[in-house]
């Protein structure tokens, strides 16, 4: 069996790897220092021999072995553990009966003699068994990562497919909802149009009948008046005094019923009923059939923080810079957060209201569980029973989620619309000026909800002094 590579590179004198190898005439190799010291010890005998074959030399010449020195240098550049751990049982090189190694850096099998060692300097080289074990672990880790990625992609695809189906279903449902909403408006408009046209026809018929009756009556009276005038003209044409005077006595009888006072009275056709701000008139008549309309909410003074000032009608709330009001504390009242709740509690149905937030730099509005804590510092977030949006830092808007969700608002809000569909678990915020969407909470509400308002603190420099005001639509 062939010797290991290390055995081939050992000096037989020091039993270590060659250092500055030299060769003798017999072609055996030694470390220059080792053979020199050996021959120094033999000087007394007057002969110098080869420690391997015992061939003697009178004046031996030490020839440097550059090739062997290169092999030693290249061998030394490989990790010693890799060389020592190589097994003779490893797959042999076809050209050399030597142990094959594996370069982990290049991912390649290599033979020390066949391959150029310089190509693998500073590389991670190991034995076949160690390379097998390490690459097995590495590939298993990669397989696990791929399997994890496969599972994540499968779950993502399932989610996307579910969202695709839900989006299609929601779109179909929304088409129906939008169609029904507009059809209801169309139906209401058609009904109002029909009623108005019928009313117009009735007014027209009534007016025309009245006029026609008066035309008939005045036509009859006109004929009698004309007859009376004819009688008088004939009498006045009589020039004979006796004849003229003789017929005067019968004139009164002949003129009876011929003279009528006009006294014409009539009502103008009611055109004003069908002109003027016609669309506004129609809108007002439709308003009672539109649902939901902005609710006339009021604030609950019993929940208001002591710093808050409410209007007499409880629709306006402002932060007061003066000392806190001497209000009686109760479990209902906020004691740290400058907040107030609405008086009405919602547990079903569809509701909508609007809040004027113009010229403010800070506020919070939305909904709160009726049972939510009102004492101490409160985290305004769904897990605490609050579903709100907030204006902060002067011109930023966020939904109070966990963490906050920044809202994409182009222009500063002047009025915010709040839409609640309790049964569907929807709370939607709008820019009430153009009804553009701001944010949607989708929740399964566990109990009664109250509208929530916080005007924020005002500042001595005049910032945020404007109140929050519930917008009441009056028809």
Swiss-Prot record:
> What domain of life does the UniProt record list for this protein's source?
Eukaryota
**What modifications does the entry list under PTM / processing?**
Polyubiquitinated, autoubiquitinated in the presence of UBE2D2.
Upper lineage is: Eukaryota, Metazoa, Chordata, Craniata, Vertebrata
Q: What is known of its domains?
A: The RING finger is required for ubiquitin ligase activity.
Q: Which UniProt keywords apply?
A: Coiled coil, Cytoplasm, Immunity, Innate immunity, Metal-binding, Transferase, Ubl conjugation, Ubl conjugation pathway, Zinc, Zinc-finger
Task: Spell out the SUPFAM superfamilies in the cross-references.
Answer: B-box zinc-binding domain, Concanavalin A-like lectins/glucanases, RING/U-box
Task: Using the record's annotation, list all stretches that form the B30.2/SPRY domain.
Answer: 277-475
| PROSITE patterns, A to Z | B302_SPRY (PS50188), ZF_BBOX (PS50119), ZF_RING_1 (PS00518), ZF_RING_2 (PS50089)
Q: What pathway does the UniProt record associate with this protein?
A: Protein modification; protein ubiquitination
What EC number(s) is this enzyme filed under?
2.3.2.27
Quote the subcellular location field of this record: Cytoplasm
The entry sums up its family as follows:
Belongs to the TRIM/RBCC family.
Q: Which GO terms describe its molecular function?
A: identical protein binding; transcription coactivator activity; ubiquitin protein ligase activity; ubiquitin-protein transferase activity; zinc ion binding
Q: Which Pfam families match?
A: PRY, SPRY, zf-B_box, zf-C3HC4_4
Protein name as catalogued: E3 ubiquitin-protein ligase TRIM62
Zn finger limits (RING-type):
11-54
């Amino acid at each position: 069996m062939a010797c290991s590579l290390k055995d081939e590179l050992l000096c037989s004198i020091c039993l270590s790897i060659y250092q500055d190898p030299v060769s003798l005439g017999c072609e055996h190799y030694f470390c220059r220092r080792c053979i020199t010291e050996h021959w120094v010890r033999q000087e007394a005998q007057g002969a110098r021999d080869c420690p391997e074959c015992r061939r003697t030399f009178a004046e031996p010449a030490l020839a440097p072995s550059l090739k062997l020195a290169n092999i030693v240098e290249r061998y030394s550049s490989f990790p010693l553990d890799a060389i020592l751990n190589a097994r003779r049982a490893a797959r042999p090189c076809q050209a050399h009966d030597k142990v094959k190694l594996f370069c982990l850096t290049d991912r390649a099998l290599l033979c020390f003699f066949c391959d150029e060692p310089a190509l693998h300097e500073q590389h991670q080289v190991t034995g076949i068994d160690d390379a097998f074990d390490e690459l097995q672990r590495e590939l298993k880790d990669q397989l696990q990562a791929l399997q994890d990625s496969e599972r994540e992609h499968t779950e993502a695809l399932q989610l996307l497919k579910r969202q695709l189906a839900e989006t299609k279903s929601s779109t179909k449902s929304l088409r129906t909802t939008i169609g029904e909403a507009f059809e209801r408006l169309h139906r209401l408009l058609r009904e109002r149009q029909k009623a108005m046209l019928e009313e117009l026809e009735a007014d027209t018929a009534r007016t025309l009948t009245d006029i026609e009756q008066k035309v008939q009556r005045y036509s009859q009276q006109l004929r009698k008046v004309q007859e009376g005038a004819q009688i008088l003209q004939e009498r006045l044409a009589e020039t004979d005094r006796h004849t003229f005077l003789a017929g005067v006595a019968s004139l009164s009888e002949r003129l009876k019923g011929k003279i009528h006072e006009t006294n014409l009275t009539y009502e103008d056709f009611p055109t004003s009923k069908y002109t003027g701000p016609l669309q506004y008139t129609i809108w007002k008549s439709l308003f009672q059939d539109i649902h939901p309309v902005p609710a006339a909410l009021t604030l609950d003074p019993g929940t208001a923080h002591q710093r808050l000032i409410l209007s007499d009608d409880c629709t306006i709330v402002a932060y007061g810079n003066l000392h806190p009001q001497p209000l009686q504390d109760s479990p209902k009242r906020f004691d740290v957060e400058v907040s107030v709740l609405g008086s009405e509690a919602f547990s079903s149905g569809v509701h909508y209201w609007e809040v004027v937030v113009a010229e403010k730099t800070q506020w919070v509005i939305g909904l709160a569980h009726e049972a939510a804590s009102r004492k101490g510092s409160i985290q305004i977030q769904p897990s605490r029973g609050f579903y709100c949006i907030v204006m902060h830092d002067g011109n930023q808007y966020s939904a109070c989620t966990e963490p906050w969700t920044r809202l994409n608002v182009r222009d500063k809000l002047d009025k915010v619309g709040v839409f609640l569909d309790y049964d569907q678990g929807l709370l939607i915020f709008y820019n009430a000026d153009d009804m553009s969407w701001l944010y949607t909470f989708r929740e399964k509400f566990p109990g009664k909800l109250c509208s929530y308002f916080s005007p924020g603190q005002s500042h001595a420099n005049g910032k945020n002094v404007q109140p929050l005001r519930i917008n009441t639509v009056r028809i």
